[in-house]
Amino acid sequence: MASGRGASSRWFFTREQLENTPSRRCGVEADEELSHRQQAANLIQDMGQRLNVSQLTINTAIVYMHRFYMHHSFTKFNRNIISPTALFLAAKVEEQARKLEHVIKVAHACLHPLEPLLDTKCDAYLQQTQELVLLETIMLQTLGFEITIEHPHTDVVKCTQLVRASKDLAQTSYFMATNSLHLTTFCLQYKPTVIACVCIHLACKWSNWEIPVSTDGKHWWEYVDPTVTLELLDELTHEFLQILEKTPSRLKRIRNWRAMAKKPKVDGQVSETPLLGSSLVQNSILVDSVTGVPANPSFQKPSTSTFPAPIPLNSGSTSVQDSRASDNLSVLAAGMPSTSYSLSSHQEWPQHPDSARTDPVYTQKQEATLSGSQYISFQQGPSMALHSGLHHRPDKVADHSSAKQEYTHKAGSSKHHGPIPATPGMLPQKMSLDKYREKRKLETLDVDTRDHYLAAHAEQQHKHGPAQAVTGTSVTSPIKMKLPLTNSDRPEKHVAEKKERSGSLKLRIPIPPPDKGPSKEELKMKIKVASSERHSSSDEGSGKSKHSSPHISRDHKEKHKEHPANRHHSSHKYLHMHSGGSKHTADGMPPTVLRSPVGLGPEGVSSASSARKKLHSSEASHNHHSKMSKSSKSAGSSSSSSSVKQYLSSHSSVFNHPLPPPPPVTYQVGYGHLSTLVKLDKKPVEPHGPEANHEYSTSSQHMDYKDTFDMLDSLLSAQGMNM
């Protein structure tokens, strides 16, 4: 929730009130009560991460818990049921509501990790459901329905931006603000602006940085909260450190860190030890005494009232005695193990599930897995490598400044085995100019040789392709028909003509032998007949040839046998069909796939490869074909159309599935370079029978065949192809 300034003062308590809480009146000691609060916050953090809610929701739930126990005792309300209630309510308030069932299951998994999942039908689940719903009402009444919470994180971000603090300092301050909620009761004593100033002040001492005064002569905290003084900051910082000192299990954790420091690095990984010698030892001033940071009057101030970037103090010059430093470092490391210089990861923490519940300290390993948008982590993964002596941080944490990176590497040289050398294979190999030219020449020679071989192979296959296509079959064997991948069946410059040769499907349809096949005399008569006598039948034939697949029938193959001269013309025809089909595709005619449950044949694949090889040459010579190519193309198209019509009329009962009618648009039908404009009717006649699949009304189409047949006849006569 967006927090409005001016929270109710009824939720800020004095020290006397904190010493007289309901838990204290019930006989709970102050340290024990603080331990209960820390463990409750730890449980809320763990549950929030498993429920995948934002860190803002988790922080709000922790504040609910702190305020609730200012009016109720830990002896009457167990923290293990109040924590799920607070998170359940906070998720609703922050608009990240989670199901009650999920909250109860996650709470059970966190509290009892070794037990099986909770069954929703068992009595324990039903009892927890009733308790949580009842406690939610009690919590709302206790809070007085003041559910909007102000957090210090907002003021921390604003102040660090105001003073132009480094990313490292801003992240450390943000981390301290979260720790103040988990480990202290500052949210019950001070306003969020005061807590933000304390966190920034503590982060400055922790990171050994200084924020100078502004051009107006004011300290940075005066811009955040005018009531804050340096004495108050020092006092609260000292109190924060005392709370960290009382945090249990700190020595156990520091011993684990020191044990990890003695382990050698394996497989180029960075050791998971925090740099105690660089960050903790040199920041021991936090424990010895809390003193104010003197202003630097000699620092060049900018012209505006904003603060310049913080400057580092004399880092590395502080000397610490070993007798006292070990205990003090234990205090600091236990409370705030993941500082800006730390490269520790969550694997170094104790992984025992029981210890996570019994230790009252907030488990830091949970903060390492938070999302970067809600919570800024300060832990480094174990797989991050060191290159060029610089510590690279993960993506969640911003990069250090170059000065701090060098300082970290120098100070941590005792913990690491020196910078890891770069991989030998990473550097590019240097090559002289002569060697480069020789290598380039060899590569070019190989490419030319390969292209020459492929061109020769394609030409050879192109020569043998028609020979395989005209191979005859017996009358009783299945007929090989080539079905194009598109439904455009008109003999025009279309994709179907391109696919007929390159991407045709070979469909084997076993049919009974015909009683009497069409003779060559009949085929000749179909071409030589006068247009006046053939007007209606040619209309029907054109509909068949346009609305049926261009099958290559057995008669057409026999015609190719008897006219070997067509073999030479067919090669020109296929080249021209390729160039025409590609040009028509560029005009925007979308081809429709003819669905047939067959695959490509070997002849189709070889012809497709050869056609692709010859595509560029055919496109270059597209406009320079001779009359022989035109006439042969026209003759081949006419004979193919007539033979297909004859075949379909004699065996129309085989094809039980009609092809879809063409779309009602205007097409350019071309026989070679002879083109006639054909306008299809907007409502094509739908076939209703096996014979009607290829027959349409003559009134739906209009075409002047007389000129076309006269031109065909004259061309055939000119070439000596007159039959």
Curated annotation (Swiss-Prot):
Residues 1-298 are annotated as: Interaction with MDFIC and MDFI. It is found in: Cytoplasm, Perinuclear region; Nucleus. SMART domains: CYCLIN. Residues 250-298 are annotated as: Interaction with POLR2A. Residues 297-325, 340-364, 385-428, 458-645 are annotated as: Disordered. There is a cross-link at K404 (Glycyl lysine isopeptide (Lys-Gly) (interchain with G-Cter in SUMO2)). GO terms for cellular component: cyclin/CDK positive transcription elongation factor complex; nucleus; perinuclear region of cytoplasm. GO terms for biological process: cell division; early viral transcription; late viral transcription; positive regulation of transcription by RNA polymerase II; positive regulation of transcription elongation by RNA polymerase II; regulation of muscle cell differentiation; skeletal muscle tissue development. Interacts with CDK9 to form P-TEFb. Interacts with POLR2A (via the C-terminal domain (CTD)); mediates transcriptional activity. Interacts with HEXIM1; mediates formation of a tripartite complex with KPNA2. Interacts with HEXIM2. Interacts with PKN1; enhances MYOD1-dependent transcription. P-TEFB complex interacts with RB1; promotes phosphorylation of RB1. P-TEFB complex interacts with MYOD1; promotes the transcriptional activity of MYOD1 through its CDK9-mediated phosphorylation. Interacts with MDFI and MDFIC. This is Cyclin-T2. It comes from Mus musculus. The lineage of its organism: Eukaryota, Metazoa, Chordata, Craniata, Vertebrata.
